């Protein structure tokens, strides 16, 4: 039997990354706590439970749950829809590429070693995360076309933040697949996903 609670949390993680990308592209900034939650998820590779990936508490996925609920209600921004569905598609490509998976695992291990020297949200770490996305994930499939302010999208720091958040989105997409998530559920069990997302969201104080 599918654990829709965990599937929805992982999918909310994907949607949260999509929302952060939109914020960065249109405003050059993102909610700081939610941004850190996304970055931190890259460092939690052996969680005891799914909540551990997102700071140990469901409240850290509030923005993602809000976004997911709007998306499942067909009320969401079309660009957001494109972002999170593209992340799921890239995860599908990654799951079939053993070389890319191994390289990604090695690069994430090296990323974790850099914590000794740099804060996770430092420009150096963001650059490393962005390079991991550009080197390994981006070549796997169709590039995600980000829409926003040209002035912001030209800034290297904003570019690195967006790619780092996209990498976190891939982390959540991998988790979604591990929890039993499938695209068929999004098509045929949308009401179940929506009801579960609303139930989880209502538990956040």
Curated annotation (Swiss-Prot):
Superkingdom field: Bacteria
Keywords associated with the record: Cell inner membrane, Cell membrane, Cytoplasm, Membrane
Cellular location(s): Cytoplasm; Cell inner membrane
Membrane topology: Peripheral membrane protein
Coiled coil: none
GO cellular component: cytoplasm; plasma membrane
Keyword Cell inner membrane in record: yes
Disulfide bonds: none
PANTHER family cross-referenced by the UniProt entry: HIGH FREQUENCY LYSOGENIZATION PROTEIN HFLD
Family according to the record: Belongs to the HflD family.
Protein name per UniProt: High frequency lysogenization protein HflD homolog
Lineage: Bacteria, Pseudomonadati, Pseudomonadota, Gammaproteobacteria, Pasteurellales
